[in-house]
Swiss-Prot record:
Ranges in a coiled coil: none
Entry's Gene Ontology cellular component terms: plasma membrane
A Pfam family recorded for this sequence: 7tm_4
Protein name: Putative gustatory receptor clone PTE03
A molecular-function term among this protein's GO annotations: olfactory receptor activity
Membrane topology (UniProt): Multi-pass membrane protein
Keywords for this protein: Cell membrane, Disulfide bond, G-protein coupled receptor, Membrane, Receptor, Transducer, Transmembrane, Transmembrane helix
UniProt similarity note: Belongs to the G-protein coupled receptor 1 family.
Cytoplasmic side: 46-67, 144-165
InterPro entries, A to Z: GPCR_Rhodpsn, GPCR_Rhodpsn_7TM, Olfact_rcpt
Disulfide cysteine pairs (residue numbers): C22-C104
Organism annotation: Rattus norvegicus (Rat)
Gene from which the chain derives: Olr1145
Location relative to the cell: Cell membrane
């Protein structure tokens, strides 16, 4: 939603975005950002299993587990996007306001509201720290275990193979 809007704005020399367009853009950005975080964590777990438990890789990383991790990522991201979207819709705005950018950000919309935004701010900080911190923690834990496993390998050839597995 950002690129088509940007192309229209470049042609019309207009940087404003409508309220409906802003809500739509917010929802898609939150959806895809959340999915990206959780999918990166799933990829880190995949690398962890491939390096630290190579003999059990096919038993652990079955198609069913990959599907569950992907669908869980999608469901959590949809709930997050809907929750923020619905909380933005309950805000009231005193006057007709335009966001002077081609891209609509959650913080900008909350700042433009003339109603109480305490719940929105709490939700933003809670969801951001949870949906950012949990995947980040999983990624850090996975790569910590990978690095410690690689450092315990006796030969440099096996270390090289392990690092090349991480890079692929």
């Amino acid at each position: 939603t950002t690129v088509p809007k940007m192309l229209i704005n470049l042609q019309k020399q207009n940087k404003a975005i409508s309220y409906a367009g802003c809500i739509t853009q917010l929802s898609f950005v939150l959806l895809f950002a959340g999915m990206e975080n959780f999918l990166l964590a799933a990829m880190a777990y995949d690398r962890y299993v491939a390096i630290c438990k190579p003999l059990r890789y096919t038993a652990i990383m079955k198609a069913h587990l990959c599907l569950v991790m992907t669908l869980l990522s999608l469901c959590i991201s949809i709930v997050d996007a809907l929750l923020h979207g619905l909380m933005i819709l309950r805000l009231s705005f005193c006057t007709f306001l335009e966001i002077p950018h081609y891209f609509c950000e959650l913080y900008q919309v909350i700042k433009l509201s003339c109603s109480d935004t305490l719940i929105n701010n709490i939700l933003v900080y809670t969801m951001t720290s949870t949906l950012g911190g949990v995947p980040l923690g999983g990624i850090i834990f996975s790569y910590f275990k990978i690095i410690s496993s690689i450092l315990r390998m006796p030969s440099s050839g096996s270390r090289h193979r392990a690092f090349s597995t991480c890079g692929s």
